């Protein structure tokens, strides 16, 4: 039995930090575990310009606790809209701080109202991204109300993603937080210009977790949890050693009152034990030897960034996740609140 894991410090390639006091509450959880994180731009006022991305980055860095200063690098993204210009993409690329552009279909998830209503309106901008090798990060769900919510990812592949890649074959794309066997098979079958992130919660939970023992709002996220066959396909992909599947938590904190309400928000907070969760998942699959590559190598390799040189260690030691944590003056219920985790940072 392995009692200690020491490996290259990982990165989180999909993270929601929020802003202000809320960000100050959750940022240390990520910065203690990860060297870098790809910061999502869907604030209440979306990050749509390079100038806004630079200002947000400065706020993140200033919010780091003193003991973590210099140990964490936020990687910034822009929020793609119908009116994002090719010139803005050029500015973003030249800035050196914007690493990617995020596509949210309008209405697909939290703070996505300003997202893209028709991908054809972005043709010139996407062409510039292809030319400059600026990656596109995709929330892969259609928002057609006629499509069943459990099929939105599968339909997105056929309706949006395949035509997009045919039109822009040189565009680098990350299929974010995949949740289905179809998404796994698509990434495996396509060129090396497309990769996918996989969350801890989609690896651990299937859609039964939404309803077992009553409605469970803290397990509600978008894309929603899927059938067990899809969870198993995700675990197989994450632990396969395939270099185009890598870690992205999609950790998305919301106040307790916004989760336990008549119209609850989508999002699961996992940053408090993210790498520990992944270690559990890989251990259960008998693939602890492949955790380092998934968490620390494949992401930077795909983005053309250097791998981290420092290390972290996890000990085989059980600890209990608190039932609630402070969140910018509110309370937050973390993933697996009150439960034991068998690895400890």
Swiss-Prot record:
Gene3D superfamilies per UniProt: Metal-dependent hydrolases
Enzyme class: hydrolase
Chain segments annotated as transmembrane: none
Catalytic activity: (S)-dihydroorotate + H2O = N-carbamoyl-L-aspartate + H(+)
Active site: 250
PROSITE patterns for this protein: DIHYDROOROTASE_1, DIHYDROOROTASE_2
Purpose of the protein: Catalyzes the reversible cyclization of carbamoyl aspartate to dihydroorotate.
Complex formation: Homodimer.
Protein name, UniProt field: Dihydroorotase
Native source organism of the sequence: Nitrosomonas eutropha (strain DSM 101675 / C91 / Nm57)
Lineage summary: Bacteria, Pseudomonadati, Pseudomonadota, Betaproteobacteria, Nitrosomonadales
């Amino acid at each position: 039995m392995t009692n200690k894991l020491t490996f290259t410090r990982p990165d989180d390639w999909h993270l929601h930090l929020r802003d202000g006091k809320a960000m100050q509450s959750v940022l240390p959880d990520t910065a203690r575990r990860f060297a870098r994180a790809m910061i999502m731009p869907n604030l209440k006022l979306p990050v749509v310009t390079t100038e806004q991305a630079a200002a947000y980055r400065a706020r993140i860095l200033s919010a780091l606790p003193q003991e973590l200063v210099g140990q964490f690098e936020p990687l910034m993204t822009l929020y793609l809209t119908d009116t994002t210009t090719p010139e803005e993409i050029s500015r973003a690329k030249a800035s050196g701080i914007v690493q990617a552009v995020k596509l949210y279909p309008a209405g697909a998830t939290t703070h996505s109202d300003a997202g893209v209503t028709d991908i054809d309106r972005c043709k010139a901008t996407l062409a510039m991204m292809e030319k400059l090798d600026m990656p596109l990060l995709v929330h892969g769900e259609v928002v057609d109300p006629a499509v069943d919510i459990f099929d939105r990812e599968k339909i997105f592949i056929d309706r949006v993603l395949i035509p997009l890649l045919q039109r822009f074959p040189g565009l680098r794309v990350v299929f974010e937080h995949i949740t289905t066997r179809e998404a796994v098979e698509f990434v495996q079958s396509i060129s090396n210009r497309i990769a996918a992130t996989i969350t801890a919660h989609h690896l651990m939970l299937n859609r039964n977790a939404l309803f077992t023992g009553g409605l469970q709002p803290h397990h509600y996220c978008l894309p929603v949890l899927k059938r067990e066959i899809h969870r198993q396909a995700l675990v197989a992909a994450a632990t396969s050693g395939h270099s185009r599947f890598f870690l992205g938590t999609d950790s998305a904190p919301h106040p307790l009152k916004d989760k336990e309400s008549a119209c609850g928000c989508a999002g699961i907070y996992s940053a408090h034990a993210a790498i520990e969760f992944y270690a559990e998942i890989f251990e259960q699959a008998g693939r602890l030897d492949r955790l380092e590559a998934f968490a620390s190598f494949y992401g930077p390799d795909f983005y053309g960034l250097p791998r981290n040189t420092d290390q972290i260690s996890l000990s085989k030691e059980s600890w209990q996740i608190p039932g609630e944590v402070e969140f910018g003056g509110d309370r937050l219920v973390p993933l697996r609140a009150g439960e034991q985790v068998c690895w400890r940072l």
